[in-house]
């Protein structure tokens, strides 16, 4: 699993399941969404946003891993920043104290 921060959507969390080739997300206007992707090559993904109800524009978007896999740079200019630690570890620690 990879965890990403999306600054263009109020800093929402994105989870990329690299084994299932699925991206899970949440936005202020859509509480939960799931999209799929395929690999175009080692560093490029083609993401199918047809299942995301609030997505506007192109339904298939290309994104590329950059900055030693710390950035996902989308063709629309958005850049997701990678979170190296699982955010749920901190949440579980906080909730169980």
Give names to the regions the model predicted.
Residues 1-5, 18-24, 40-52, 67-72:
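Short, hydrophobic/aromatic-rich segments at coil-to-beta transitions
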Residues 60-84:
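Short, compact, well-ordered microdomains
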Residues 1-14, 19-25, 75-82, 92-94:
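Tryptophan-anchored aromatic micro-motifs
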Residues 12-17, 31-41, 53-67:
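Short, exposed beta-strand/loop patches in secreted or surface proteins that constitute
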Residues 37, 90-97:
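Low-complexity, intrinsically disordered flanking regions
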Residues 8-10, 24-33, 48-56, 73-79:
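Secondary-structure transition/turn motif
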